[in-house]
From Swiss-Prot:
Organism name: Salmonella paratyphi A (strain ATCC 9150 / SARB42)
Function: Together with LptE, is involved in the assembly of lipopolysaccharide (LPS) at the surface of the outer membrane.
PTM notes: Contains two intramolecular disulfide bonds.
Family: Belongs to the LptD family.
Signal peptide: 1-24
One CC-aspect GO term: cell outer membrane
Principal cellular location given in the protein's record: membrane
Keywords noted in UniProt: Cell outer membrane, Disulfide bond, Membrane, Signal
Protein known as: LPS-assembly protein LptD
Coiled-coil features, chain-numbered ranges: none
Location in or out of the cell: Cell outer membrane
Gene: lptD
Amino acid sequence: MKKRIPTLLATMIASALYSHQGLAADLASQCMLGVPSYDRPLVKGDTNDLPVTINADNAKGNYPDDAVFTGNVDIMQGNSRLQADEVQLHQKQAEGQPEPVRTVDALGNVHYDDNQVILKGPKGWANLNTKDTNVWEGDYQMVGRQGRGKADLMKQRGENRYTILENGSFTSCLPGSDTWSVVGSEVIHDREEQVAEIWNARFKVGPVPIFYSPYLQLPVGDKRRSGFLIPNAKYTTKNYFEFYLPYYWNIAPNMDATITPHYMHRRGNIMWENEFRYLMQAGAGLMELDYLPSDKVYEDEHPKEGDKHRWLFYWQHSGVMDQVWRFNVDYTKVSDSSYFNDFDSKYGSSTDGYATQKFSVGYAVQNFDATVSTKQFQVFNDQNTSSYSAEPQLDVNYYHNDLGPFDTRIYGQAVHFVNTKDNMPEATRVHLEPTISLPLSNRWGSLNTEAKLMATHYQQTNLDWYNANNSKKLEDSVNRVMPQFKVDGKLIFERDMAMLAPGYTQTLEPRVQYLYVPYRDQSGIYNYDSSLLQSDYNGLFRDRTYGGLDRIASANQVTTGVTTRIYDDAAVERFNVSVGQIYYFTESRTGDDNIKWENDDKTGSLVWAGDTYWRISERWGLRSGVQYDTRLDSVATSSSSLEYRRDQDRLVQLNYRYASPEYIQATLPSYYSTAEQYKNGINQVGAVASWPIADRWSIVGAYYFDTNSSKPADQMLGLQYNSCCYAIRVGYERKLNGWDNDKQHAIYDNAIGFNIELRGLSSNYGLGTQEMLRSNILPYQSSM
């Protein structure tokens, strides 16, 4: 539950542990040039037990009551040092105290320093017993970290635990620059609790105050403390000017919340974004409730709905209790289907098409586990498309390995499917799947022989409307029993590449799998949860062509593949390439005429797939993959990515993405596959780049172009300036945000973002380029 908080006004005394990577390290080093360091040996132990050393040009006194030192006075005790033109030492025996009270008055060019702070002023006072120190009308500077300011009176109390400023100011900017500062009539900073209390707080940019609060209690370190976080602002075409002012609330050691008023000018209201985190015996989780009381844009577009409250609720939970119980929640629900088109949210996207609402409770012990779950979908589609929910679903697994040379498993499932429409089929499905396998392996190969029986019973209801409108009739009660047999063998050959590359090693890994599943006509079963699985190289060796249990395709096939890898002398993989195919002895089918290729009687080498990775050097990397399906008569999908990465702030990446229209029609639901934006498939080229362009300036950008539509799919450009005491980030993004069916063209959203970050308050001196790239609608993913 630990949370780092870069607060707006939590600037009094902040720890700065600098990173040492790329430009961030250079900037951190530059910022430290104006920061003093503690170069004397660090003294440990009780300060009162340490001797006091006084050096001066002249001294006179009335022993043991007082003494006066003048001329280059230098007093040291432990890690503390006091220098002045004149120092008056007073010693009084307090009644009932074994030790006398020793105080010091310092006059002229007073300089106090220890391993945490430097105080300078014309007049000072110190208690040598308690180490309490006062300096009037002076300056202070943090030692070993950014932070300086002025005050009418500066106090050190509680063995340097507290710093108290009267009419004081603070900035993390280096000397000679007061770009921003915070001023308070009184400031009390508690180093131990890492909190600052500020009365009459004014935040200033240059000499101009822009924010005022009569009282603030702010976090000033890594401890979780309630307080305002750094605000943010941006401009978008869908919401115009937007402003965020988050507030962090440390409720308890095991729970906290972030409350963010989010003003949207075009919507004419404030959305309240409320994030709550918790940690308890049953697990950890996060809840988000976003609420917009009214939306004048939505009301104009949907006048029949009146004054619409718009909201989002998200709940994620994962936990284990008593080592055997498992609890999981993944729940997202919004007020309407346009929510993710109108508002940016990290809990969903307009391109997702639906929101998932899943609850599960599991029980697991050795050799056995069981899970009860419910799963629903909120579909965002104007065509009022139906969807199925599992209410409820029971999954059971029993394992018994090392039964002689065999491993055994029994998997069972019972689920009830309910549709969002009243006239669609519904069903109860019970599935039992016993498996026995014989695994054999050694260091150079493996052979796994497996046999299983898949028995499924369907009890289907509400079939009248469907059977009346379709030539293929569904049956009330269906039993499907299918055996499966599989043999999977793999070898690993290894050789030293001493002749070509000394120290390098190459492997050759051939793999062969035979799979047999007899054909069963499944046309009398409605498809409740099955969809085609993508066939990359690893996918060639799956047992199933479809996910779910409603469609289990017949198989009489051999899958062959080979992988070769190259490792350097440090055992780092530098290169690999895999290629494989599925050879069908008989047609793979389910009896479902709605599946296009089942109408074609094709056998032979139907599916090919290949993947490759090449780490060309420490700075260059290449990944690519291609899948070809003769049943679709086309390349199904392909992708490639070439990246140059000098460090975390300097990178260029070129990308290509392709999905054939036949593949989309075969894999996506009909309301997507027939949509205008997908009917020609996906064929995109793009580039992502991040590069410093001048001292402390950096630029990032992303551009993706769809060659089918001859239009850009996504564009992003960001510019950031980074200094020791602040960073400014400006970004522009134009992204696809839907499709206008009436006008038959894409809808784009233009967004301009503006963010200011105060520096010197945390350990991060990076340029922020990675964050900007990953926030893109087509987020950056490393190829290295």
